[in-house]
UniProtKB/Swiss-Prot annotation:
Glycans are attached at residues 240, 882, 900. This is Proprotein convertase subtilisin/kexin type 6. GO terms for cellular component: cell surface; collagen-containing extracellular matrix; extracellular space; membrane. The record marks 132-133 as: Cleavage. Residues 149-468 form the Peptidase S8 domain. Serine endoprotease that processes various proproteins by cleavage at paired basic amino acids, recognizing the RXXX[KR]R consensus motif. Likely functions in the constitutive secretory pathway, with unique restricted distribution in both neuroendocrine and non-neuroendocrine tissues. Residues 680-898 are annotated as: CRM (Cys-rich motif). The gene is Pcsk6. Its EC number is 3.4.21.-. It comes from the Eukaryota. The active site is at residues 186, 227, 401. InterPro entries: EGF-like_dom (IPR000742), Furin_repeat (IPR006212), Galactose-bd-like_sf (IPR008979), GF_recep_IV (IPR032778), Growth_fac_rcpt_cys_sf (IPR009030), Kexin/furin (IPR034182), P_dom (IPR002884), Peptidase_S8/S53_dom (IPR000209).
Amino acid sequence: MPPRAPPAPGPRPPPRAAGRHGLSPLAPRPWRWLLLLALPAVCSALPPPRPVYTNHWAVQVLGGPGAADRVAAAHGYLNLGQIGNLDDYYHFYHSKTFKRSTLSSRGPHTFLRMDPQVKWLQQQEVKRRVKRQARSDSLYFNDPIWSNMWYMHCADKNSRCRSEMNVQAAWKRGYTGKNVVVTILDDGIERNHPDLAPNYDSYASYDVNGNDYDPSPRYDASNENKHGTRCAGEVAASANNSYCIVGIAYNAKIGGIRMLDGDVTDVVEAKSLGIRPNYIDIYSASWGPDDDGKTVDGPGRLAKQAFEYGIKKGRQGLGSIFVWASGNGGREGDHCSCDGYTNSIYTISVSSTTENGHKPWYLEECASTLATTYSSGAFYERKIVTTDLRQRCTDGHTGTSVSAPMVAGIIALALEANNQLTWRDVQHLLVKTSRPAHLKASDWKVNGAGHKVSHLYGFGLVDAEALVLEARKWTAVPSQHMCVATADKRPRSIPVVQVLRTTALTNACADHSDQRVVYLEHVVVRISISHPRRGDLQIHLISPSGTKSQLLAKRLLDFSNEGFTNWEFMTVHCWGEKAEGEWTLEVQDIPSQVRNPEKQGKLKEWSLILYGTAEHPYRTFSSHQSRSRMLELSVPEQEPLKAEGPPPQAETPEEEEEYTGVCHPECGDKGCDGPSADQCLNCVHFSLGNSKTNRKCVSECPLGYFGDTAARRCRRCHKGCETCTGRSPTQCLSCRRGFYHHQETNTCVTLCPAGLYADESQRLCLRCHPSCQKCVDEPEKSTVCKEGFSLARGSCIPDCEPGTYFDSELIRCGECHHTCRTCVGPSREECIHCAKSFHFQDWKCVPACGEGFYPEEMPGLPHKVCRRCDENCLSCEGSSRNCSRCKAGFTQLGTSCITNHTCSNADETFCEMVKSNRLCERKLFIQFCCRTCLLAG
């Protein structure tokens, strides 16, 4: 296939086929090259791969861990424990079945599903999950790359990006992510990287693939597990250390969950999403199902429950924040609505734009995208600078993989400004503060609530300064309501080319106060369609305000005949609009040339799920005063308005018999209409309630009220106060259940602020130890320490001097190994920086690089780093490919080591072609041709 753009200056690209490089027509065996060229076409015609089953099961067993252990043992399984935070769900393992098989397991152990204590089980399938980094085109590897962080400096005179994300402006206001914890769900992070180590948080890290607490990536020659380390640097690379870059939240804590470097199953994803939800604030994920233009996939049953647990229970009930990359399948015509992770109401789906504000070639369009950041673009546009594997830096990070950690870092700045933001508050803030700026898209529209929105960029480019300023004064939005409109289960044929329209008229659950939705947030369409070629479908939703959301675009590569079964499409384009009215669903079938147009699809059923609030999310209305008859109070009343003209003739009521009995002791001097406390005309002490709740006289006000002696009324305390001295939130004396009394401010809070902890027995916020930034249960039981202290066994210990490390076993500072300048432990393998005259090799400091390595200067490091020579070199100088000696079985050709091997089937003409075209110097061709020729001499 010809290249998509002219090659950049540099080394000559490898030949495409033998016949195009001077080989005569008589050259032998050209069929070898034809076979190679034909392979992609053959592979594309293969049927989709069959599912791969593992020897792991997810099982729901009631009765607790003991019951699960007994059930597992009875059927030959091992119970590996509860799955994350999901009660009654357990991870079973069977050692006597195939580790990986295309057939689901059979045998006596399958009787497990008939056990009466087993409510549900699922043999785990391997899920394909790909890292969302745009593929590099080797034609442009030698193009110049800007080494500065251009996306932080768009205001510079010569910058091509005209609009700022205003990260520096947020920093200038004092927000750098302090006390916020972000975790990267990926292939691990290099915790000893000099730019990550200062902010690395072991408590926010775990290795799900290896089942231990070290999230370090697996190292190999290809460095394929670099993705998580790159994402982590964008969030929280340390500042002012003369190394690599500055992270967006450079004072935030950064952790890593290693979960992509192995079989990814529903259990693996659920465990990863549920790691320490009350400690980790933000989870960032730059991966998902294949972006191949034909896959429809999303979270399984367990992962969905983990998402729900996180938003309900995470961050002490405020909700975990999940940030997701929207996908890189633009070149394949993919649509991110077919990705159940970015299409979820629980995730913040983030898109990308180029430095010029253009649509990147990898971008996927869909209605669930919330916001956008800068990232890479065409080969001539700059990429993103960040940390890289083996303590390096890179200026080549690309794709929407960049955008998710960028937004995670910006949200960390907002959480520092206001740590009481809920997961929905954060989404509202992004909607309010993101802006179209100079982002170019033909589909920008203003929705019914006045928000400008696009399928490419959501609500636009994130604005860090606007986000922190809005967060600082933010009031929590009202509670979320969910209204399910009646499902339309009438099957309808989908006519070819024409548009099938069906409507749903809803009052948005106005009859149910706990479900009523007036102002929209997310709108979900749950739909089932049968169709001979799924990729020919287009689906739109039109709101009562007229906003049109594209739920699905045509996908040329999706030839599946599976259609959709209860698939949920989500749109945020109706955010802030009124929910009540007529909704229109449009389904269009545009048949491709490879399909018989006479075969029609069928819309089986669809339903509408509305999420939002019953009250306006951004305004508070004062309650109207009751116009009904009230008890006479000892305060002056307003004079009634004078009506123009003669007053109307009042009807003369029948005379009622006047009460002459004894009044209640709490009745005042104006008497009563009966003997009870709710029949007084005025009160001795206080009146309680109103005309709707039968106002009565009381001697003292109950809990939740205070006595207004001037008005002789019981007035309600501020929300959360149990006893108080006034209506203000700062006049609380004690708090209701679920709140804690902050004695220094006399307020009632659901979470104690930094520096205080919640005492459950007294329901008080008490001060942590002076060394603690955050603590739990006790003054000295720390989770975060102040500057100058380190966390050890729940206590804050003073930081150690250079050349020493903190020994958590002995609770003191210990000496580093003599080869280390700085370290994390006593052995030579635990150095961070090396002592003078030592080099860094394989995580150790050595006096000289070993055989097969060469020394290289690293900017910002006080020592050299030993780099590995090419795999065939015994030794090299200055570069990995500049071999000076070769391993046994290899011959030196220039600066390369080539296999010293002959084969009887290579004739002189073929070998001459190999030599003349210097194919053996190109690694790609070593296996194809070099082993067939004797090249020595």
